[in-house]
Amino acid sequence: MAESPFKADIERAQKELTEKMTPGAIAYIPGSSVINKTGSWRVFKPEFHKDKCVRCFLCYIYCPEPAIYLDEEGYPVFDYDYCKGCGICANECPTKAIEMVREVK
């Protein structure tokens, strides 16, 4: 899977903020999972049904992490290395083209 186009920007911003802030339990950058793979502790994962998708991009827009990309045709592609399995994409999908299924490892 291709590397996130946002990764370099997030890493640079994180470095700048880290130098200026005192250490603590703060989420000071949204979309930090692109730097830290979080897919290994997911319980549910999104399963995509292309035949139901109307390419509204709501899943892409609402994903709190940059874990959804759009392919050349405008369909979502899920990067399971960074998907936390929160289900926001499935909840926002108006046609139920995304279903949350139990992760099997």
Swiss-Prot record:
Keywords: 4Fe-4S, Electron transport, Iron, Iron-sulfur, Metal-binding, Repeat, Transport. It comes from the Archaea. [4Fe-4S] cluster 2 binds at residues 63, 83, 86, 89. One of its GO terms (molecular function) is oxidoreductase activity, acting on the aldehyde or oxo group of donors, iron-sulfur protein as acceptor. [4Fe-4S] cluster 1 binds at residues 53, 56, 59, 93. Residues 44-73, 74-103 form the 4Fe-4S ferredoxin-type domain. Binds 2 [4Fe-4S] clusters. Its cofactor is [4Fe-4S] cluster. Signal peptide: none annotated. Heterotetramer of one alpha, one beta, one delta and one gamma chain. PANTHER family: PYRUVATE SYNTHASE SUBUNIT PORD (PTHR43724:SF2). This is Pyruvate synthase subunit PorD. The lineage of its organism: Archaea, Methanobacteriati, Methanobacteriota, Thermococci, Thermococcales.
